């Protein structure tokens, strides 16, 4: 390397150090990841808070939901002036307390001042929601407190007065969200709590009245699940508002749909006799999805598919994407999904019950065959038929494998589509017999990359 090039490299390095904005000797990960200091009005609010508490505080950021700031400005009483809601922790010996303080602005004195604070032992804030639950014109603040990280949480509801904040409820929960399931133009909180020790799972619809908390709707859910994913507020296919819960059950997943009807909270997919939901049980990688982009969520439901590999005992399935109206399912799309390679095959109606598939995970191949049977498809695999001619071989390769031509027959394989890392290929045999046939152009419409 020439002396000139060495000098240029040293100069570039020196300039980079000057403009790096941190001390390479003293910087550490905690400092680099620490949140920015509050400025302007928020700084004044924090100073008012610190003067009222008289102990060091650490601002706490909600980990999910719409509000992610430790200090939230919102006009909850519609008087034209924002109130500030501050979340912070304080430490006393070995205990850490989580705190909520409402900080108001005094126009006459041109300063912020803190009301009394609400305190409980905990570790963080999961989510914050504002909702007028007692219809008095002032929004309540609904806080999901993390007691022991995500393993135990408590839901608190607070009402804000002129001079004090009142706690209206404090209960254990797993998930919650603001809804209007009964469509009375009055918001409610739908709270769900999974008690894995007791194997119970319950959804409750909560409002406030003059006597306090009113749970005017409650229903059981599957208590055999281990994990509840984030619930989604979305309409049924008939337009009625509902909340969809995807849950992990054993090695699979289920969906429960909660809505309000006939004066009660309903969960019709829950079998009250067997105390579980089995009708939606499928691969754990499959979740609710608006698969046809019509604004209605579809639930993935498993239907048996013939395994063409007679040496394999593995059960294969179609995935039926179904809209739900609260009583019945309507199939919107039928797919065969490869979760390992990240794609689905949207199956034409005329193929249903007339194909069998073999899978080779090591070679990243799926082979579709004709399946010869006189029986009409019923959702259960008809094993009385026969495996017929091959329809198509689907193969997945990486971009580098595709570019180098490794691992597949370049003369026969045709690219159907590609994702960020993978290329999906098809090989259609010549002179195939059978009722099911396909072209490359049809496959390009049928195969869709998916993320799992």
Residue ranges and their predicted role:
Residues 248, 370-378, 427-433:
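Secondary-structure transition/turn motif
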Residues 426-452:
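Surface-exposed amphipathic alpha-helical segments
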């Amino acid at each position: 390397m020439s002396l000139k090039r060495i000098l240029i490299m040293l100069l570039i390095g020196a300039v980079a150090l000057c403009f790096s904005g941190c001390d390479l000797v003293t910087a550490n990960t905690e400092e680099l990841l620490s949140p920015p200091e509050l400025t302007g009005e928020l700084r004044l609010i924090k100073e008012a808070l610190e003067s009222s508490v008289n102990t060091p505080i650490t601002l706490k950021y909600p980990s999910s939901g719409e509000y992610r700031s430790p200090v939230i400005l919102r006009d909850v009483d519609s008087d034209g002036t924002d109130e500030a809601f501050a979340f912070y922790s304080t430490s006393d010996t070995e205990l850490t307390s989580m705190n909520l303080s409402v900080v108001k602005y005094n126009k006459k004195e041109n300063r912020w001042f803190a009301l009394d604070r609400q305190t409980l032992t905990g570790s963080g804030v999961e989510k914050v929601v504002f909702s007028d639950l007692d219809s008095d014109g002032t929004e309540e603040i609904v806080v999901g407190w993390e007691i022991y990280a995500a393993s135990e949480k408590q839901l608190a509801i607070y009402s804000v007065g002129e001079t004090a904040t009142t706690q209206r409820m404090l209960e254990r929960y797993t998930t919650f969200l603001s809804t209007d399931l009964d469509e009375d133009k009055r918001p409610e909180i739908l709270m769900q709590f999974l008690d894995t020790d007791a194997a119970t799972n319950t959804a409750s619809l909560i409002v406030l009245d003059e006597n306090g908390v009113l749970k005017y709707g409650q229903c059981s859910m599957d208590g055999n699940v281990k994990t509840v994913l984030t619930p989604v507020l979305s309409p049924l296919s008939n337009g009625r508002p509902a909340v969809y819960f995807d849950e992990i059950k054993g090695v699979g997943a289920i969906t429960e749909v909660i809505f309000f009807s006939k004066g009660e909270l309903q969960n019709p997919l829950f079998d009250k006799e067997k105390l579980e939901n089995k009708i939606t049980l499928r691969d754990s990688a499959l979740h609710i999805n608006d698969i046809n982009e019509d604004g209605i969520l579809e639930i993935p439901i498993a239907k048996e598919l013939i395994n063409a590999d007679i040496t394999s005992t593995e059960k294969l399935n179609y995935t039926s994407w179904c809209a739900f109206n609260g009583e019945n399912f309507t199939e919107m799309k039928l797919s065969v999904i490869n979760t390992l390679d990240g794609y689905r095959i949207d199956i034409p109606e005329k193929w249903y019950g007339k194909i069998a598939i073999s899978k080779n995970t090591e070679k990243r191949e799926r082979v579709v065959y004709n399946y010869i049977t006189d029986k009409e498809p019923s959702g259960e695999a008809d094993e009385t038929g026969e495996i017929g001619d091959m329809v198509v071989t689907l193969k997945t390769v990486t971009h580098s494998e595709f570019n180098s031509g490794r691992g597949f027959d370049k003369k026969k394989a045709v690219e159907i589509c590609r994702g960020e890392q993978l290329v999906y290929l098809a090989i259609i045999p010549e002179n195939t017999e059978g009722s099911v046939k396909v072209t490359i152009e049809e496959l390009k419409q049928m195969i869709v990359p998916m993320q799992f």
